[in-house]
Amino acid sequence: MWKLKVAEGDKNSPYIFTTNNFVGRQIWEFDPNAGTAEELAEVEEARQNFYKNRHQVKPASDLIFRLQFLREKNFKQTIPQVKVEDGEEITYDTATAAMKRAAHYFSAIQASDGHWPAENSGPMYFLPPFIFSLYITGHLDTVFTAAHRREVLRYLYNHQHEDGGWGIHIEGPSSMFGTVYSYLTMRLLGLGPNDGENNACARARKWIRDNGGVTYIPSWGKNWLSILGLFEWAGTHPMPPEFWMLPSYFPLHPAQMWCFCRLVYMPLSYLYGKRFVGPITPLIKQLREELHTEPYDQINWRKVRHLCAKPDLYYPHPFVQDVLWDTLYLATEPLLTRWPLNKYLREKALKQTMKIIHYEDQSSRYITIGCVEKPLCMLACWVEDPEGVAFKKHLERIADFIWIGEDGMKVQTFGSQTWDTALGLQALLACNIVDEIGPALAKGHDYLKKAQVRDNPVGDYTSNFRHFSKGAWTFSDQDHGWQVSDCTAESLKCCLHFSMLPREIVGEKHDPERLYEGVNFILSLQDKNGGLAVWEKAGASLLLEWLNPVEFLEDLIVEHTYVECTASAIEAFVMFKKLYPHHRKKEIENFLVKAVQYIENEQTADGSWYGNWGVCFLYGTCFALGGLHAAGKTYNNCLAIRRAVEFLLQAQSDDGGWGESYKSCPSKIYIPLDGKRSSVVHTALAVLGLIHAGQAERDPTPIHRGVKLLINSQLENGDFPQQEIMGVFMRNSMLHYAQYRNIFPLWALAEYRRKVPLPN
């Protein structure tokens, strides 16, 4: 039986290090002897229910850890379920009952260290590179046991489409990228070419070959296939490591890149520069025959470089980019790989690149910035020294990425511990029932205090192209180390709330100096346009986006500014100003003026705001309205709020709720769910947005209708149903935030009960 372990790690191991006693760490362990017959039956029932409904609801309900936590805490919902009949008014008591039921359930799924665990996955390309890297290094069998393999295969079977393929993400249509990666994972885990549940391998292979074969995989896939020996490096775009030796102000230096893009390019440029290829095993030779539509030794690698399957092509390469690739391929790279440049320049560039890889690994305790980068950095360390300490430290941190759900084993981005906790605590605080949920609040407060980043990246971080991180909060845990603006703003809001509550209930308030450090970090990221970036200050030319080589993602070359991050910062600073009016007062006031102007400028023609990190216009609009409301803007004095209200009211469905398709994200146009269905998360976001906009003072009917749907959707134990996927990054890659179905409905119910007049 699988069990989630929290805040644990081998403190005696020389290969793992923690900055705060592993607070926030969440790892899964399999115990073949654990679990009663009843507990095992519960887990199996959850798996079977997911399988039966897998084509209707793609994201898992995250039941494996929830069943464990509810069982360990002996949770029983004691508040009777409530429903609102047609024509019936929602009373204060009804709203209170629904809110308390949600709050008590949510408190019960809190971890012992105070954070809220959850799945944060969804893309089908997260897991396979871990398999690839471990296969190449010979550690696949030791890291992924038979129990792991069963869950990986369960995940692949559950998310295979009826046409045999897999999408870029779990809700997307079949793609070459997702299908090739999933097929290779099954084969490397030991399945034969015609094995797998429901003939999984044969169906996948047919989809690949019917769509042109593996030469049509996007560029990221071409890189990994070259590493595996299923492609030739001659069929990929050049990634010369010499770019790391350019002056950092040079437009094409990686320092100008968005941090995730920079840290993918970093190990890839090392592996490309060495032309590294893993062992050509009999299985690799067989896979060459299975995946290519012509004999491997007859493929014209130069001609396949620009190929991309139609289902994967979201961002076609501009002509200028193809010219750059061809110049590097035909002129630059042949020079760099011949004597004397290969001896003096290339070797020096490889050493410089590896030095930066080691720096980034050490700064993140070998977690790295994310799951795409992790297996590449781990492999680069192994290529440099198969017996080296760096590689062994990487192995110790693989567990930090693994997540088990009723749909199987997947790989996380890197965990959303702090983000989910900061939002969830605000939802609980809005309930105003401190006496009932005091222990959950106290533990959450303690977690946030321990999760704040206390130091900057190690050593001379500026020469390694890093922004300072001291005082920030991360998306995941403190060990991860990567500062995030909206996570900092939301965590700061929580700490400020807690400072106004009795210490005997929620614990000692956070040290003001630590709060000042958080404020300083947020201030450092405001752009000249007034908006806030996420990780590092924006400022590189947006023209560099023309060089985006990733065919299925957009806006990933340079750092941008975002409405959601800016709105979160506005709310945090307005609150901070009231409690600490003297710290950088003038700078905060200037920040707020520019930030409000930025949000107003970013509003779309239909009155909504595009959501960069959630689906999509409803998500962005909720955050934007929260920021404008905090800044003192109202329906009467702000045209942007009036236009936003009009958008929300027009988007309301006949059942009283709201529901938006993930397709809004890539299309950048509001698209409702099929049949104008509603979802509890979108309904909650819209209700919160309308409350921010003062709709209750004008006509509360739309809010009542939305809350009625929330109350009637609540499950018997206080949970809410899992529905569509709700997160996104880079326009076209969706993320499953499993806690959103609890956090936002709870928050909406709490604000509704506090701010909308209701009959007793």
Curated annotation (Swiss-Prot):
Reactions performed catalytically: (S)-2,3-epoxysqualene = tirucalla-7,24-dien-3beta-ol
Organism: Melia azedarach
GO molecular function: beta-amyrin synthase activity
PROSITE patterns the UniProt entry points to: TERPENE_SYNTHASES
UniProt xrefs under Pfam families: SQHop_cyclase_C, SQHop_cyclase_N
Enzyme class label: isomerase
Protein name stated in the entry: Tirucalladienol synthase OSC1
GO biological process, one term: triterpenoid biosynthetic process
PFTB repeat locations: 99-141, 149-190, 441-485, 515-560, 592-632, 641-689, 703-744
